[in-house]
Amino acid sequence: MHYFSEKPTTKSDVKIVEDILRGKKLKFKTDSGVFSYGKVDKGTKILVENVVVDKDDDILDLGCGYGVIGIALADEVKSTTMADINRRAIKLAKENIKLNNLDNYDIRVVHSDLYENVKDRKYNKIITNPPIRAGKEVLHRIIEEGKELLKDNGEIWVVIQTKQGAKSLAKYMKDVFGNVETVTIKGGYRVLKSKKL
């Protein structure tokens, strides 16, 4: 049973984790059957610390898990959409918005298989720590279909372990967007960015 399954079958065992992201002390309820259980994932942290957002941005946290990316950025942007196929993750993300006192911000959490249920708007930024184990085809769909949902000059930001195919993903992003930038290389991870021109 993978964290990118719709309904995890593992027994629930909630753990609260605390972390400092972008200078903010945040708390997250995590649970078994959801990605990065019991601690904030290193790749996600590197992505969150390096992504550049603007106060007028509408952002999409794709494959949000229990909500780290969207929650860390929600008070810096205009609107935040968080999407995941995993229903346990969706429930946790909603609870974590409350836990971090973000109820007054424009945040929505959507149960969605990739972009299926979030096509109702366009985004300035799509930010994702993609489910590498779901395979290359899923990764390619994230890039390709993401381009369609970006506003002009919008960007897709992706974190990936160097050893899990970062170079071939960068090449694919360049093929789709005509550009790719390696924003940072740190701790065995790369943060990649492509812009819709």
Swiss-Prot record:
GO terms (BP aspect): rRNA base methylation
Residues engaged in binding S-adenosyl-L-methionine: 63-67, 84, 129
Residues involved in substrate binding: 129-132
InterPro entries documented for this protein: RsmC/RlmG, SAM-dependent_MTases_sf, Small_mtfrase_dom
Gene3D superfamilies: Vaccinia Virus protein VP39 (3.40.50.150)
Keyword annotations: Methyltransferase, S-adenosyl-L-methionine, Transferase
GO molecular function: rRNA (guanine-N2-)-methyltransferase activity
Known EC number: 2.1.1.-
Keyword check for Cell cycle: no
Pfam family, one: MTS
Keyword match Transferase: yes
Annotated SUPFAM superfamilies: S-adenosyl-L-methionine-dependent methyltransferases
Function (record text): Probable methyltransferase that uses S-adenosylmethionine as the methyl donor. Binds neither NAD nor NADP in vitro.
Protein family: Belongs to the methyltransferase superfamily.
Protein name as catalogued: Probable S-adenosylmethionine-dependent methyltransferase MJ0882
Annotated source species: Methanocaldococcus jannaschii (strain ATCC 43067 / DSM 2661 / JAL-1 / JCM 10045 / NBRC 100440) (Methanococcus jannaschii)
Taxonomic path: Archaea, Methanobacteriati, Methanobacteriota, Methanomada group, Methanococci
